[in-house]
Regions:
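Short, structured patches in soluble enzyme cores that scaffold and shape functional sites
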Residues: 88-90, 101, 134, 154-158, ...
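A short, flexible helix-boundary coil/loop motif
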Residues: 180-195, 265-376
């Protein structure tokens, strides 16, 4: 196994585009095998969002961003790294496409547009809609996305914008359409043809969803109605996407947080810094993204539905780890042994299944509640 210094040194020497090319080959094979089917509404969405991977007060490199932290002991300059990631939302499972670091002196949208252009060049037919949070509801992002032949979707939550004021006034004058979904009861409004956003070259569409669902409070165990008010702005016309499709695409934005950043940081330790250099940190994150995509594809495409119902991805990862360490020589602890017994014999090949069973039963995880359909 390579040491931490070796991992950092090698990642600093590797070109990031070479790792991106391998990830693109993985996408190409999955697409050819029809493993990336679109959702029920037929539109593939690429979610864009930023993530902060590292922050400290001492070390600084050429790719570090700076901010001033105000504290009781005075102001301190903090150095940190942020990047924009793009994740493809499909009908089967999400797939991370690419990562672009935010350079000093630029904002998140500038890095997102650079990442968007690279995705359109290398993944021209991978997605139909580029979606983001409220920060992406900007005219430069919408105009650039439309100029490349894609549609844009973002959360609209700035109460001072004329577009949101006009949409809310129309909602007060128009009766809502009630829809029962898996999330609960929703009251929906859908208006298109807004021209009160003069910086945007095309007329936009506003979709509002007031969702009510029952939640059980952890403190007293009582059920309580929770109301959430969501508003999205998009360039998708009503003839291309229904109201329910826009709502589902808007909620799919959380997949990059729950199944993207959360998975990579907590289970894959993608934020670990082996070497504080911009290229080394970027390459290691791209390698982690590639490993995550490979393991997810193996779990969904190579395992039978019955096995996926019994074991989750964490248990399968323990099986990988058990097989890896079972074939490594284990150095004996204590005083130096004789030369002929310096290392213990590795486990024989036929004992791999025993190591798998021990890895699974050591710390069992709860099985999945629902069985997934068989792969196409």
């Amino acid at each position: 196994m390579p040491s931490a210094d070796t991992v950092g040194r090698v990642c600093d020497l590797v070109e990031a585009d070479s790792v991106r090319h391998i990830n693109h080959e993985l996408y190409r094979h999955l697409k050819r095998n029809k493993a990336l089917a679109p959702p029920s509404h037929g539109l593939l969405v690429a979610i864009f969002d930023a993530h902060e991977s590292h922050a400290n007060y001492r070390r600084c490199c050429g790719g570090c961003l700076q901010r001033t932290i105000h504290g009781k002991s005075g102001d301190r300059i903090q150095y940190y790294h942020r990047f924009v990631a793009a994740q493809l939302v499909t009908g089967a499972w999400p797939l991370l496409l690419d990562v672009e670091p935010i350079q000093p002196g630029e904002d998140e949208i500038a890095a997102a547009l650079r990442l968007f252009d690279r995705l359109v060049d290398h993944y021209p037919r991978a997605f139909d809609v580029a979606a983001g949070d409220g920060l992406y509801a900007r005219s430069d992002f919408f105009n650039h996305v439309r100029s490349r032949g894609k549609h844009a979707l973002a959360v609209l939550k700035d109460e001072q914008r004329d577009l949101l004021k006009d949409a809310r006034s129309l909602c007060e004058q128009t009766p809502a359409t009630e829809v029962v979904t898996a999330r609960g009861l929703s009251q929906c409004w859908d208006f298109e043809g807004f021209t009160t956003w003069p910086q945007c070259h095309d007329a936009v569409r506003v979709v509002r969803s007031v969702e009510t669902r029952q939640v059980r409070r952890q403190l007293d165990g009582q059920w309580e109605a929770q109301i959430a008010d969501w508003v999205w702005v998009t360039t998708l016309p009503q003839i291309a996407a229904s109201t329910g499709a826009v709502i589902r695409m808007g909620h799919a934005r959380w997949s990059i947080e729950n199944e993207g950043f959360n998975e990579l940081v907590n289970r894959w330790h993608a934020d670990h810094v082996y070497k504080h250099q911009a290229n080394a940190m970027l390459v290691f994150y791209l390698l982690t993204v590639l490993a995550y995509n490979l393991s997810t594809a193996f779990y969904h495409r190579n395992l039978k539905p019955a096995l996926r119902c019994a074991y989750d991805t964490l248990q399968i990862a323990r099986m990988f780890s058990a097989e890896l360490y079972a074939q490594l020589p284990i150095c004996a602890r204590g005083p130096d042994p004789p030369a002929n017994v310096a290392f213990l014999n590795p486990s024989p090949p036929n004992s791999t299944s025993v190591a798998f069973a021990r890895a699974i039963t050591a710390r069992p995880s709860p099985p999945n509640r629902h069985c997934e359909p068989a792969p196409l």
